[in-house]
Regions:
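N-terminal helix-rich structural modules
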Residues: 1-134, 138
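Fold-level signature of zinc-dependent metallopeptidase catalytic domains
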Residues: 80-255
Length: 255
């Protein structure tokens, strides 16, 4: 919600004060859309007085244009440019008004610390090794802002519960598709239906090895590429449920 529009939190507080039927209805739809714009109606506003949905979400400085940010990025040194265009940073203004990249681990420090605590508690409660590994590594990633190890752990999941938690989709950043939005969905693996797919899943690597693609983009040998069937129990944030790791060193293999 905070990543979609800077005014969302204040608007939410205002909606919570409206106890009328219309107010309750607006609140419900606001929570579904994570903002005052209907995603099913080309982002048309359904609450009076709000601006158009910001194309850059809340990832870039207030008052900045796409051209402003683009020109700033173009003038950066390679390392700074990589940070500015990375999945896990916002762009803000420093005390002097100049643009700077801020890691998610700092931008959302309070929320991520709380989330990491919940993930560590869940890891302590499970007896499933790959699930424990993912939850622990994802908790660490929220604090360090380095998601690679936890993305690998996610792709190695072999547990009855299939969690996807973290910054994944970039469609909220309509300016550049640089910035990943946080989302979570929790699913339970359907072992009976998954078993029916094993006949095909066991051949995926064989098929990929014969495709005319560079070795660099092939699935790593230690990643399980078999398809799984899951029942989705809970979804938070987006209206879509793709959820692959955004790290360019990885690619999704789960269905």
């Amino acid at each position: 919600m905070r990543q979609t529009w800077a005014g969302n939190e204040m608007l939410l507080l205002k909606l919570l004060e409206d106890s009328t039927l219309l107010g309750r209805t607006r609140l419900d739809y606001f929570l579904v859309n994570k903002g005052p714009w209907s995603r099913l109606d080309d982002d048309a506003a359904f609450i009076p007085g709000v601006p158009e949905k910001p194309a850059g979400g809340n990832y870039y400085p207030a008052g900045a244009t796409r051209a402003d940010v683009e020109a700033w990025i173009a003038g950066l040194a390679p390392a700074a440019r990589e940070a500015a265009t990375g999945f896990f940073t916002t762009i803000r203004r420093d005390a002097g008004g100049k643009f700077m990249a801020v890691p998610y681990s700092l931008e959302y420090q309070g929320e991520l610390a709380e989330m990491a605590g919940h993930l560590r508690a869940a890891a302590a409660a499970t007896k499933q090794p790959t699930l424990k590994s993912f939850l622990e590594s994802r908790a660490a990633a929220l604090i360090s802002n380095d998601y690679y190890a936890s993305d690998v752990a996610w792709m190695k999941l072999d547990s009855s519960i299939e969690p996807t938690i973290g910054p994944y989709e970039v469609y909220e950043d309509e300016w550049f598709n640089y910035k990943a939005a946080f989302e979570a969905f929790i699913a339970v693996r359907d072992d009976a239906e998954t078993a029916k797919l094993d006949r095909f899943g066991s051949e995926l690597q064989w098929l990929e090895d014969r495709l005319p693609i560079e070795v660099l983009v092939r699935t790593p040998d230690d990643i399980d590429s078999r398809a799984k069937l899951i029942d989705l129990l809970e979804l938070a944030h987006g209206m879509e449920t793709e959820g692959p790791p955004p790290d360019m060193r990885l690619k999704p293999r789960e269905s």
